[in-house]
From Swiss-Prot:
Designated gene of the protein: trpR
Protein localization: Cytoplasm
Subunit structure and binding partners: Homodimer.
Organism lineage string: Bacteria, Pseudomonadati, Pseudomonadota, Gammaproteobacteria, Enterobacterales
Family of this protein: Belongs to the TrpR family.
Alphabetical keyword list: Cytoplasm, DNA-binding, Repressor, Transcription, Transcription regulation
One example GO MF annotation: sequence-specific DNA binding
Name of the protein in its database record: Trp operon repressor
Function per UniProt: This protein is an aporepressor. When complexed with L-tryptophan it binds the operator region of the trp operon (5'-ACTAGT-'3') and prevents the initiation of transcription. The complex also regulates trp repressor biosynthesis by binding to its regulatory region.
An annotated GO cellular component: cytoplasm
Amino acid sequence: MAQQSPYSAAMAEQRHQEWLRFVDLLKNAYQNDLHLPLLNLMLTPDEREALGTRVRIVEELLRGEMSQRELKNELGAGIATITRGSNSLKAAPVELRQWLEEVLLKDH
């Protein structure tokens, strides 16, 4: 098995640090009630739509009333996107999953 080159590891670390910087920026934007303008600046309309679809995928997977194929037809998302969402949800920490259930399913 080939090892990752130090350059690749360094690039991965840089990307991770950039992600954490964005998360900190978003946290600060929430504290200053600037989160919507920031997200509108940083995300294209397609990216915002994709995030909304992913929230719906997670919500419906948590609800457990539809098959992945039904979700695909209902949401117009690709089956691979739904499968990734399902796998990510299975791998998510228990605390996150419980929180998502409370937040996303509270009115349903």
